């Protein structure tokens, strides 16, 4: 979906989604959300982004790659991505593989978003000291960018 500004510039519309809990079963919530994304794809929305949250009522899509692979299979045009993968929770090499696979499954429609996370208890539940979050993020981002942009990956950390 595209609109124009007063001076003629394009505005591309997208959706940011938490896939939050409601009174329905998780299966029904996912089915409803996937139908919504299919509709957005048909209506020419530019992109669909999903949050990653853990152990909160904010989201049941706590595995963005898995959820977005279902989105990719049900759509053909809309761009998609996580906003954000919580880098302190991931092994960077494993995430590189997931990102590449998701980009292939979506036929190049992946929009990659990464971040540190803002809710300390979410990362703490995975044994990550929130005080170490910045350092873990910085190192993971370095490895991720090398892995996605260089022919070989060589990193000691």
Question: What residues fall within each predicted segment?
Answer:
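N-terminal beta1-alpha1-beta2 module of alpha/beta enzyme domains
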Residues: 1-80
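Internal, glycine-rich beta/alpha segment that forms the wall or movable "lid"
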Residues: 2-10, 91-157
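Structural motif
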Residues: 51, 83, 113-115
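Positions that flank functional sites
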Residues: 55-56, 86-87, 118
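Glycine- and other small-residue-rich loops at beta-strand/loop junctions that grip anionic moieties
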Residues: 60, 84, 133
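Short, solvent-exposed loop/helix junctions and linker helices
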Residues: 61, 89-92
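Short, solvent-exposed loop/turn segments at the edges of secondary structure
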Residues: 62-64, 75, 82, 107, ...
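Active-site nucleophile and cofactor-binding loops and adjacent substrate-binding regions
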Residues: 82-90
């Amino acid at each position: 979906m595209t609109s124009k500004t007063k001076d003629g510039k394009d505005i591309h519309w997208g959706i940011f989604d938490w896939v939050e809990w409601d009174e329905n079963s998780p299966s029904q919530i996912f089915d409803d959300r996937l139908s919504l994304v299919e509709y957005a794809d048909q209506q020419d929305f530019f992109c669909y982004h999903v949050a990653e949250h853990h152990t909160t009522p904010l989201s049941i899509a706590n595995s963005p790659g898995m959820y977005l692979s279902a989105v990719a299979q049900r759509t053909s045009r809309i761009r998609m991505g996580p906003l954000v993968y919580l880098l302190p929770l991931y092994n960077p090499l494993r995430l590189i593989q997931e990102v590449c696979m998701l980009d292939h499954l979506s036929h190049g429609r992946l929009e990659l978003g990464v971040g540190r996370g803002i809710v300390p208890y979410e990362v703490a539940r995975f044994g990550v000291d929130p005080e170490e979050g910045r350092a873990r993020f910085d190192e993971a981002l370095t490895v991720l960018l090398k892995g996605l942009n260089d022919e070989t990956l060589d990193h000691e950390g």
